[in-house]
Amino acid sequence: MSVMNGREVARESRDAQVFEFGTAPGSAVVKIPVQGGPIGGIAISRDGSLLVVTNNGTDTVSVVGTDTCRVTQTVTSVNEPFAIAMGNAEANRAYVSTVSSAYDAIAVIDVATNTVLGTHPLALSVSDLTLSPDDKYLYVSRNGTRGADVAVLDTTTGALIDVVDVSQAPGTTTQCVRMSPDGSVLYVGANGPSGGLLVVITTRAQSDGGRIGSRSRSRQKSSKPRGNQAAAGLRVVATIDIGSSVRDVALSPDGAIAYVASCGSDFGAVVDVIDTRTHQITSSRAISEIGGLVTRVSVSGDADRAYLVSEDRVTVLCTRTHDVIGTIRTGQPSCVVESPDGKYLYIADYSGTITRTAVASTIVSGTEQLALQRRGSMQWFSPELQQYAPALA
């Protein structure tokens, strides 16, 4: 056991079984050359038929058909695309963050027609974005000299309708933003002078038929409603100290658990498990297998696995036992996404390639997991602790 910020941190069991990439029984690996340079972001359509990736180096967004594992469309002239979110209701709609010398912006892309439908300029520097479950609102985490915040765009009009400060502490920056499955809570990974933070924000009241009210900042003491719309704005309800620098955040499919991946010089890669109801860290897991930086984390659709992306591999963590149950070695992975049916894991990398591997080839069976848990030396603890008008704002 180790101690980190007053909390003991469990380290991995020496008995954990690790599968090397492509060597597990029944493994099936397909390489998809996108050939657009380093891939910064990846998303998959709700039906699993399309992958959409951002190619920062070539100013393009590529669409890949998962049935053929081939690039079917390439959207050009998208300035330095990075973060991406796919529509839930609008299956062919993608929202992509872009960068230019004048401003960052959100590009709205129809991936079926290879068309940029609109571009919405924003003040400050965009770090990440996420959509509400009904696709009505886009939440964008931003950084600037005045601090870090989350901006809200109406996806129908492109208008900026709300901003909430994540922190007014100098030097604080947002890293990522995630939304609960029911759309009621935002989770923002941030880093400040004293370390990593998970900031919990409730979304606007939707008492007026799902519409949200006039623009306001949470730091203002009052705001006037427009018409009969709800006046309540986004509100920070909790800030959870993580310690090491936050790299990414992922939520379980039911929203009950948040997994925060962080990295520091003292403990390396760490995953904090947080109860989203109580806002308490229930356990912390230092993963010594990851020697370099952990950069991304995502959770499988059945909530059984967490995928941790690092410099030369994807590490698979059992969310029930918190044991490492698989390792997928591949060159310089950047991001991952699991297919909606849970059969495949798509791993994008900095060489411009997507690797598809069968999920069954990366994990051990449930029986093996139980055996590992019985043999392992793990100990756990409860810590004390269309073109629209610019939306610049």
UniProtKB/Swiss-Prot annotation:
Composition bias, Basic residues: 214-224
Entry keyword Plastid: no
Domain of life per record: Bacteria
Induction details: Expression increases during early growth in macrophages. Expression is directly regulated by both the MprAB and TrcRS two-component systems. Negatively regulated by TrcS/TrcR. Activated by MprA/MprB under envelope stress. Expression may also be regulated by sigma E.
Region feature (Disordered): 208-230
Keyword tags: Stress response, Virulence
Disruption phenotype: Deletion of the gene does not affect the synthesis of the major virulence factor ESAT-6, but greatly reduces its secretion. In infected macrophages, Rv1057 deletion significantly reduces the secretion levels of cytokines IL-1 beta, IL-10, TNF-alpha, and INF-gamma, but does not affect IL-4 and IL-8 levels. Deletion of Rv1057 greatly impairs the ability of M.tuberculosis to replicate in macrophages.
Matching InterPro entries: Haem_d1_sf, Host-pathogen_enzymatic-act, WD40/YVTN_repeat-like_dom_sf
Role: May play an important role in host-pathogen interactions and in ESAT-6 secretion.
UniProt name for this protein: Seven-bladed beta-propeller protein Rv1057
